[in-house]
Design a protein with these regions (language model features):
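Loop/turn-to-beta-strand initiation segments
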Residues: 50-51, 89-92, 109-111, 132-137
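Post-DEXD/H (motif II) to motif III coupling segment of the RecA-like Helicase ATP-binding lobe
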Residues: 116-175
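Conserved RecA-like ASCE ATPase "motif II neighborhood" in helicase/translocase motors
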Residues: 92-127
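Conserved interdomain hinge at the start of the Helicase C-terminal
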Residues: 19, 42, 186-197
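Inter-Walker segment of RecA-like/P-loop motor cores
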Residues: 69-105
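Conserved pre-motif I regulatory segment
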Residues: 1-27
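Conserved Walker A/P-loop ATP-binding site and its immediately adjacent core
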Residues: 35-37, 44-71
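Walker A/P-loop
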Residues: 19-41
C-alpha cells in the first residue's frame, strides 16, 4: 500500500507525461520511499503491456533494488554477469549503468527509472539519446547536479522533508558537535600521489 505522498508522486508523473514530457526527475527526500514508488510505476507499466528497466548507479544497489521488487512479488530479471536472477524474458529488468555500458545487447524497454539520477553518466546520456521515445524517470533526494537540466524536462517535488516530519513519517533530527577539536596530536603521512593521509 502506497503512502499518500507516493500516490501524489505517481499522479504528478502521469500529469507530466500527459503534457508530453519524457524526461522527468522525481525529487523526494530520504525515506520518501522512492524505490517503492518506482516498483509501483513499473508494475503499472507491465499491466499496460509494456516493459521497464530500473537502472542503478552502482552495482551494490542492484541487490537492494531486487529485494524491493521481491517484497512486492514482482518477477524481474537482473542484468549483471552471471547473476542467478538473469531472466531476459522478464518484463522488468534491473541493471547498473556500468553493466549497461558494457553490454552489446540492450533490453527493450518503454519506461526507464534511473535511481540516483544526479550521478549522471556518459552512457546514460547516450542511452537517453538512442531511446528518444522512452520515458526516463530520474529519482533523487539531491537533484542539484550541474547540467541535470540538460537531460531532464520536468522536476516533480511531491513532498518536502519538513512535510514528512510534520506528518510523522520521519523523526526529528538532533545535531551534536564539539566546540573545538584538538588535532595537534593526529599523525599524518604524505602519500606517493602527493596527498596526505
Amino acid at each position: 500500500v502506497l503512502r499518500p505522498h507516493q500516490e501524489r508522486a505517481i499522479n504528478q508523473l502521469r500529469h507530466s507525461i500527459k503534457k508530453g514530457n519524457k524526461r522527468i526527475v522525481l525529487a523526494a527526500p530520504c525515506s520518501f520511499g522512492k524505490t517503492i514508488t518506482a516498483v509501483e510505476i513499473l508494475i503499472n507499466v507491465v499491466k499496460n503491456g509494456k516493459k521497464g528497466i530500473f537502472i542503478c548507479d552502482r552495482i551494490k544497489l542492484v541487490q537492494q533494488s531486487l529485494e524491493a521488487f521481491d517484497r512486492a512479488g514482482i518477477r524481474v530479471g537482473v542484468m549483471q554477469g552471471d547473476h542467478w536472477r538473469t531472466d531476459p524474458n522478464a518484463d522488468i529488468q534491473i541493471a547498473s549503468i556500468q553493466t549497461l555500458s558494457r553490454r552489446r545487447y540492450q533490453p527493450i524497454f518503454h519506461v526507464a527509472i534511473v535511481d540516483e539520477c544526479h550521478t549522471h553518466y556518459k552512457h546514460l546520456t547516450e542511452l537517453m539519446e538512442k531511446n528518444s521515445k522512452v520515458i526516463f524517470i530520474g529519482l533523487s533526494a539531491t537533484p542539484y547536479s550541474k547540467g541535470l537540466g540538460k537531460h531532464y524536462q520536468d522536476l516533480i517535488v511531491p513532498i518536502t522533508t519538513e512535510q514528512l516530519l510534520d506528518k510523522d513519517y520521519l523523526c526529528p533530527v538532533k545535531y551534536y558537535g564539539g566546540n573545538h577539536v584538538d588535532l595537534s596530536k593526529v599523525k599524518t603521512k604524505r602519500l606517493p600521489t602527493g596527498g596526505v593521509d
